[in-house]
Regions:
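Interfacial segments of alpha-helical transmembrane regions
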Residues: 49-78, 140
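Membrane-embedded catalytic cores of phosphoryl/pyrophosphoryl-handling enzymes
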Residues: 102-229
Length: 230
C-alpha cells in the first residue's frame, strides 16, 4: 500500500509541475482574480434572482439554507478534519522540497497543508447542488466550467496538487448529493416544484451572461494591470 501511495504521489507531483509550468504575468493576474471569492458575488446574486423569479420565496429560502449548510459541511470536512489529519504540504510551501520548482503568483503560498482543496470542495459542492436545482439547464454547462476553472486556478497558483483538487471535488459531489436528497426527503413540498420546471426556468440565461461578463472584466483588468506593471 505504501508503494502505491508513493507512486500515485509521484505521478501527482509530475502532473502538477507540468500544468503549473504554463504561466506568464497576464495569467498570474487572471487566475488570482478568478479564484478570489468575492469576484463571483454578482454571479451568485443573479442565480439567487433566477430562483426567486421561478419559485416561491419559501422554496428559495430553503434552497439557500441547504446550499449554505452543504458548503459549511464541505469546508469543515476539508479544512478542519482532513487537512490536519493528512498533513500533506502544499507544493508552494517553502518547506516542501519541490517548492523551488513551483511557480507562485505575487508570493501567495496559502496555508501549510493543502489536501484536500477547500476551494475545489466548496466550488464543486455549490455547482453540483445548483445543478440538482436547475436540472437540464444550459446553466449547468457554465457551472461545470466555472468549478473546473476554479480548480485549475489552484494548480496554476501553485497551492494545490491535482490530487488535492480531485478529492476536493469528490467531497463536494458527495456532500451536495447527500444534503440535496436529505433536503428532498424533509422538504418534499418544496422540492416537488423542481422537476416540472427542469429545463424550463425563466431567466436562466441571466447568470450565464453575468458570469461571462465577469470573465471579460477579469480578462480586461488582467491586461491593464499587466501593461501598467511593465
Amino acid at each position: 500500500m505504501k508503494e502505491i501511495i508513493e507512486y500515485l504521489s509521484q505521478i501527482d507531483t509530475e502532473v502538477f509541475l507540468f500544468l503549473n509550468g504554463f504561466h506568464n504575468t497576464y495569467w498570474d493576474y487572471f487566475m488570482t482574480m478568478f479564484t478570489y471569492r468575492f469576484t463571483w458575488v454578482p454571479f451568485y446574486a443573479t442565480f439567487l434572482y433566477v430562483m426567486i423569479r421561478n419559485f416561491h420565496y419559501k422554496v428559495t429560502t430553503a434552497c439557500v439554507v441547504a446550499i449554505v449548510v452543504s458548503i459549511l459541511i464541505c469546508d469543515q470536512t476539508a479544512s478542519t478534519l482532513l487537512k490536519p489529519m493528512v498533513e500533506r504540504m502544499r507544493p508552494s510551501n517553502l518547506d516542501n522540497p519541490i517548492s523551488p520548482l513551483v511557480h507562485v503568483a505575487f508570493d501567495y503560498r496559502g496555508g501549510r497543508y493543502g489536501f484536500p482543496s477547500s476551494h475545489a470542495a466548496n466550488s464543486w459542492c455549490m455547482a453540483f447542488f445548483a445543478m440538482y436545482l436547475v436540472r437540464r439547464s444550459r446553466l449547468n454547462i457554465f457551472l461545470a466550467f466555472w468549478a473546473l476553472t476554479m480548480s485549475y486556478s489552484r494548480i496554476y497558483l501553485g497551492v494545490h496538487y491535482p490530487g488535492d483538487l480531485l478529492v476536493g471535488a469528490i467531497i463536494g459531489f458527495i456532500t451536495a448529493t447527500v444534503v440535496y436528497y436529505v433536503f428532498r426527503y424533509f422538504a418534499k413540498e418544496y422540492t416537488d416544484q423542481f422537476e416540472p420546471k427542469a429545463g424550463k426556468l425563466k431567466y436562466q440565461h441571466y447568470p450565464i451572461l453575468v458570469g461571462i461578463a465577469s470573465i471579460i472584466v477579469i480578462l480586461a483588468a488582467s491586461g491593464i494591470m499587466t501593461l501598467v506593471g511593465q
